[in-house]
Design a protein with these regions (language model features):
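Conserved N-terminal beta1-alpha1 strand-loop-helix module at the mouth
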Residues: 1-69, 73-85, 166
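Short beta-strand/loop segments at the ligand-binding rim of alpha/beta enzyme cores
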Residues: 1-3, 60-68, 116-129, 177-187
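Hydrophobic faces of well-ordered beta-strands that scaffold small-molecule active sites
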Residues: 3-7, 39-41, 66-70, 88-90, ...
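Glycine-enriched alpha-helix->loop->beta-strand junction motifs that scaffold or abut catalytic
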Residues: 35-37, 61-63, 82-88, 122, ...
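C-terminal helical cap(s) of enzyme catalytic domains, especially alpha/beta-barrels
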Residues: 59, 102, 163-164, 217-239
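Catalytic cores of alpha/beta
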Residues: 74-83, 134-144, 187, 191-205
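Glycine-rich phosphate-binding active-site loops on the catalytic face of alpha/beta enzymes
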Residues: 89-97, 148-160, 204-223
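Histidine/lysine/aspartate-rich catalytic loop segments that bind and position anionic ligands
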Residues: 126-177
Length: 240
Protein backbone atom coordinates (compact mmCIF):
# COMPACT_ATOMS: atom_id res chain seq x y z
CA UNK A 1 0.00 0.00 0.00
CA UNK A 2 1.43 3.36 -1.06
CA UNK A 3 1.62 6.59 0.91
CA UNK A 4 0.86 9.90 -0.76
CA UNK A 5 2.16 12.73 1.42
CA UNK A 6 0.04 15.88 1.27
CA UNK A 7 2.17 19.01 1.70
CA UNK A 8 -0.65 21.59 1.81
CA UNK A 9 -0.06 22.49 5.43
CA UNK A 10 3.61 23.21 4.88
CA UNK A 11 2.23 25.97 2.64
CA UNK A 12 -0.33 26.89 5.32
CA UNK A 13 2.50 27.71 7.74
CA UNK A 14 4.28 29.72 5.04
CA UNK A 15 1.18 31.69 4.09
CA UNK A 16 0.37 32.49 7.75
CA UNK A 17 3.20 35.04 7.69
CA UNK A 18 3.52 35.61 3.96
CA UNK A 19 7.12 34.40 3.98
CA UNK A 20 8.99 32.19 1.53
CA UNK A 21 9.57 29.52 4.18
CA UNK A 22 9.03 26.72 5.00
CA UNK A 23 9.79 25.55 1.47
CA UNK A 24 7.25 23.23 -0.11
CA UNK A 25 10.01 22.16 -2.49
CA UNK A 26 12.20 20.99 0.39
CA UNK A 27 9.20 19.32 2.02
CA UNK A 28 8.44 17.36 -1.15
CA UNK A 29 12.06 16.34 -1.72
CA UNK A 30 12.55 15.18 1.87
CA UNK A 31 9.22 13.35 1.89
CA UNK A 32 10.25 11.42 -1.21
CA UNK A 33 13.61 10.59 0.35
CA UNK A 34 11.77 9.33 3.44
CA UNK A 35 9.64 6.95 1.39
CA UNK A 36 6.63 8.87 0.06
CA UNK A 37 5.26 7.23 -3.06
CA UNK A 38 3.66 10.43 -4.33
CA UNK A 39 3.26 14.08 -3.39
CA UNK A 40 -0.28 15.39 -3.03
CA UNK A 41 -1.24 19.06 -3.06
CA UNK A 42 -4.49 20.98 -3.39
CA UNK A 43 -4.62 24.25 -5.31
CA UNK A 44 -7.75 25.81 -3.87
CA UNK A 45 -9.71 28.53 -5.62
CA UNK A 46 -9.08 30.83 -2.65
CA UNK A 47 -5.31 30.05 -2.71
CA UNK A 48 -5.29 29.70 1.08
CA UNK A 49 -2.18 27.51 1.07
CA UNK A 50 -0.73 26.30 -2.23
CA UNK A 51 -0.02 28.97 -4.84
CA UNK A 52 0.10 28.60 -8.61
CA UNK A 53 3.88 28.99 -8.71
CA UNK A 54 4.27 26.05 -6.32
CA UNK A 55 2.85 23.69 -8.93
CA UNK A 56 5.21 24.86 -11.65
CA UNK A 57 8.24 24.68 -9.36
CA UNK A 58 7.35 21.28 -7.92
CA UNK A 59 6.49 19.46 -11.15
CA UNK A 60 10.06 19.15 -12.56
CA UNK A 61 11.50 18.51 -9.10
CA UNK A 62 9.49 15.43 -8.12
CA UNK A 63 11.02 11.99 -8.46
CA UNK A 64 7.76 10.16 -7.74
CA UNK A 65 4.57 11.76 -9.05
CA UNK A 66 2.34 14.76 -8.44
CA UNK A 67 -1.22 14.12 -7.34
CA UNK A 68 -2.91 17.48 -7.82
CA UNK A 69 -6.24 18.03 -6.08
CA UNK A 70 -8.54 20.52 -7.81
CA UNK A 71 -12.14 21.65 -7.85
CA UNK A 72 -13.86 20.62 -11.12
CA UNK A 73 -14.11 24.15 -12.51
CA UNK A 74 -12.79 25.70 -15.76
CA UNK A 75 -10.10 27.83 -14.06
CA UNK A 76 -8.55 24.78 -12.43
CA UNK A 77 -8.86 22.69 -15.58
CA UNK A 78 -6.81 25.28 -17.47
CA UNK A 79 -4.07 25.21 -14.82
CA UNK A 80 -4.01 21.41 -14.72
CA UNK A 81 -3.68 21.16 -18.48
CA UNK A 82 -0.76 23.58 -18.34
CA UNK A 83 1.08 21.96 -15.42
CA UNK A 84 0.22 18.45 -16.61
CA UNK A 85 0.66 16.45 -13.38
CA UNK A 86 0.61 12.68 -13.52
CA UNK A 87 -2.61 12.55 -11.51
CA UNK A 88 -5.47 14.96 -10.86
CA UNK A 89 -7.96 14.21 -8.10
CA UNK A 90 -11.16 16.18 -8.51
CA UNK A 91 -12.54 17.30 -5.15
CA UNK A 92 -15.49 19.39 -3.93
CA UNK A 93 -14.73 22.83 -2.59
CA UNK A 94 -16.51 25.48 -0.54
CA UNK A 95 -14.77 28.72 0.42
CA UNK A 96 -16.02 28.72 4.02
CA UNK A 97 -14.82 25.19 4.83
CA UNK A 98 -11.70 24.54 6.92
CA UNK A 99 -10.79 21.59 4.77
CA UNK A 100 -12.49 19.47 2.12
CA UNK A 101 -15.78 18.31 3.62
CA UNK A 102 -17.29 15.21 2.07
CA UNK A 103 -16.96 13.88 -1.44
CA UNK A 104 -18.12 14.99 -4.86
CA UNK A 105 -21.79 14.54 -5.64
CA UNK A 106 -21.47 12.66 -8.91
CA UNK A 107 -25.23 12.25 -9.17
CA UNK A 108 -26.15 15.95 -9.07
CA UNK A 109 -23.10 17.20 -10.97
CA UNK A 110 -22.48 14.26 -13.26
CA UNK A 111 -22.28 16.12 -16.58
CA UNK A 112 -20.12 19.01 -15.35
CA UNK A 113 -17.63 16.70 -13.65
CA UNK A 114 -17.55 14.29 -16.57
CA UNK A 115 -16.72 17.13 -18.95
CA UNK A 116 -13.73 18.21 -16.83
CA UNK A 117 -12.67 14.58 -16.35
CA UNK A 118 -12.83 13.86 -20.07
CA UNK A 119 -10.74 16.93 -20.92
CA UNK A 120 -8.04 15.83 -18.49
CA UNK A 121 -8.12 12.24 -19.70
CA UNK A 122 -7.84 13.32 -23.33
CA UNK A 123 -4.76 15.35 -22.38
CA UNK A 124 -3.09 12.28 -20.88
CA UNK A 125 -3.69 13.12 -17.22
CA UNK A 126 -4.90 10.28 -15.00
CA UNK A 127 -8.09 11.29 -13.18
CA UNK A 128 -9.42 10.25 -9.80
CA UNK A 129 -12.64 11.31 -8.10
CA UNK A 130 -12.87 12.04 -4.37
CA UNK A 131 -16.15 10.50 -3.26
CA UNK A 132 -17.98 9.19 -0.22
CA UNK A 133 -17.89 5.41 0.32
CA UNK A 134 -21.34 4.95 -1.22
CA UNK A 135 -22.28 2.48 -3.94
CA UNK A 136 -24.39 4.97 -5.92
CA UNK A 137 -21.43 7.36 -6.13
CA UNK A 138 -19.11 4.54 -7.19
CA UNK A 139 -21.58 3.56 -9.92
CA UNK A 140 -21.41 7.09 -11.32
CA UNK A 141 -17.60 6.99 -11.24
CA UNK A 142 -17.75 3.74 -13.21
CA UNK A 143 -20.12 5.40 -15.68
CA UNK A 144 -17.63 8.26 -16.10
CA UNK A 145 -14.95 5.69 -16.97
CA UNK A 146 -12.35 7.14 -14.61
CA UNK A 147 -9.54 4.75 -13.58
CA UNK A 148 -9.34 5.77 -9.91
CA UNK A 149 -11.54 6.78 -7.01
CA UNK A 150 -10.40 8.13 -3.65
CA UNK A 151 -12.73 7.24 -0.80
CA UNK A 152 -13.41 9.92 1.79
CA UNK A 153 -12.43 8.62 5.23
CA UNK A 154 -13.46 11.75 7.14
CA UNK A 155 -16.53 10.24 8.77
CA UNK A 156 -14.52 7.22 9.88
CA UNK A 157 -11.97 9.62 11.40
CA UNK A 158 -14.61 11.76 13.14
CA UNK A 159 -17.00 9.11 14.43
CA UNK A 160 -16.66 7.04 17.60
CA UNK A 161 -17.93 3.66 18.76
CA UNK A 162 -20.49 1.85 16.64
CA UNK A 163 -20.75 4.70 14.13
CA UNK A 164 -17.03 4.37 13.45
CA UNK A 165 -17.41 0.62 12.96
CA UNK A 166 -20.31 1.16 10.57
CA UNK A 167 -18.29 3.66 8.55
CA UNK A 168 -15.33 1.28 8.42
CA UNK A 169 -17.63 -1.43 7.07
CA UNK A 170 -18.93 0.97 4.39
CA UNK A 171 -15.36 1.68 3.33
CA UNK A 172 -14.53 -2.03 3.20
CA UNK A 173 -17.62 -2.79 1.11
CA UNK A 174 -16.93 0.16 -1.19
CA UNK A 175 -13.36 -0.97 -1.80
CA UNK A 176 -14.51 -4.49 -2.64
CA UNK A 177 -17.26 -3.21 -4.96
CA UNK A 178 -14.98 -0.76 -6.77
CA UNK A 179 -12.19 -3.30 -7.19
CA UNK A 180 -14.59 -5.79 -8.77
CA UNK A 181 -15.50 -3.06 -11.27
CA UNK A 182 -11.83 -2.62 -12.16
CA UNK A 183 -11.21 0.67 -10.36
CA UNK A 184 -8.02 1.55 -8.53
CA UNK A 185 -9.00 2.64 -5.02
CA UNK A 186 -7.24 5.25 -2.89
CA UNK A 187 -8.44 6.66 0.42
CA UNK A 188 -7.82 9.64 2.64
CA UNK A 189 -9.00 12.49 4.85
CA UNK A 190 -8.62 12.77 8.60
CA UNK A 191 -6.24 9.82 8.86
CA UNK A 192 -3.55 9.99 11.55
CA UNK A 193 -1.15 7.82 13.52
CA UNK A 194 -3.84 6.40 15.81
CA UNK A 195 -6.62 5.64 13.32
CA UNK A 196 -4.88 4.67 10.07
CA UNK A 197 -4.30 1.06 11.14
CA UNK A 198 -7.78 -0.30 10.39
CA UNK A 199 -7.87 1.46 7.02
CA UNK A 200 -4.41 0.11 6.13
CA UNK A 201 -5.66 -3.42 6.84
CA UNK A 202 -8.33 -3.18 4.14
CA UNK A 203 -7.29 -5.37 1.24
CA UNK A 204 -7.54 -3.59 -2.08
CA UNK A 205 -6.63 -0.01 -1.20
CA UNK A 206 -3.80 1.17 -3.42
CA UNK A 207 -2.76 4.43 -1.73
CA UNK A 208 -3.52 6.48 1.37
CA UNK A 209 -3.19 10.26 1.12
CA UNK A 210 -2.23 11.84 4.44
CA UNK A 211 -0.97 15.33 5.24
CA UNK A 212 -2.11 17.27 8.31
CA UNK A 213 -1.20 14.51 10.76
CA UNK A 214 2.28 14.15 9.29
CA UNK A 215 2.90 17.91 9.45
CA UNK A 216 1.71 17.93 13.08
CA UNK A 217 3.91 14.96 14.04
CA UNK A 218 6.88 16.61 12.32
CA UNK A 219 6.78 19.45 14.87
CA UNK A 220 8.01 16.98 17.48
CA UNK A 221 10.05 14.34 15.65
CA UNK A 222 11.06 16.00 12.38
CA UNK A 223 9.57 15.89 8.89
CA UNK A 224 11.43 12.90 7.51
CA UNK A 225 10.88 10.87 10.69
CA UNK A 226 7.16 11.67 10.59
CA UNK A 227 6.91 10.35 7.02
CA UNK A 228 8.98 7.27 7.88
CA UNK A 229 6.79 6.49 10.90
CA UNK A 230 3.55 6.75 8.91
CA UNK A 231 4.99 4.64 6.11
CA UNK A 232 6.06 2.02 8.67
CA UNK A 233 2.58 1.83 10.23
CA UNK A 234 0.89 1.46 6.85
CA UNK A 235 3.31 -1.24 5.74
CA UNK A 236 2.93 -3.18 8.99
CA UNK A 237 -0.87 -3.22 8.97
CA UNK A 238 -1.26 -3.68 5.22
CA UNK A 239 0.65 -6.94 5.55
CA UNK A 240 -1.14 -8.17 8.68
Amino acid sequence: MDLGVNIDHIATIRQARGTNYPSVLDAATLAEQAGADSITLHLREDRRHMQDKDLYELKPLLKTKMNLELAPVPEMLKIALDVHPEDVCLVPERREERTTEGGLDLIKKFHDIREISDDLTNAGVRVSLFIAPEIDQIDKAIEMKVPIIELHTGNYADFDGELKNQELKKIQQSVEYAKKAGLLVNAGHGLHYENVQKIAKIDGIHELNIGHAIVAKALFIGWENAVIEMKKIIKEYAQS
